[in-house]
């Protein structure tokens, strides 16, 4: 199995007031080109999809466009986790629908113990969590 591991997309990031959305779109095109060229079986996004927990509307729209292209049009399964900059509650709102399209997004610790299987390979997606969440989960 071949997969492309990415992380820290930080969609919506501004650098000293300069909007990076155009650069982020270009980076996504490069990620998609690599996925196609290498004929990967899945794309991993290991946290920090957005730059802040309440991203700007434009950042959400751009990320949606990216996932429609990668997952629905190009048919790459996407394995993603929330990072410390993401709001797990906001990200998980489409969870049941996402899984039907092979867009797997884990945002809570308890989800990490349920494997996602692609081509007889199991993935365990461990999202960012606060230490208190682990203590409460394992008590």
Task: Tell what function each PLM region has.
Residues 46-48, 81-84:
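Glycine-rich beta-strand-to-loop/alpha-helix junction loops that act as flexible
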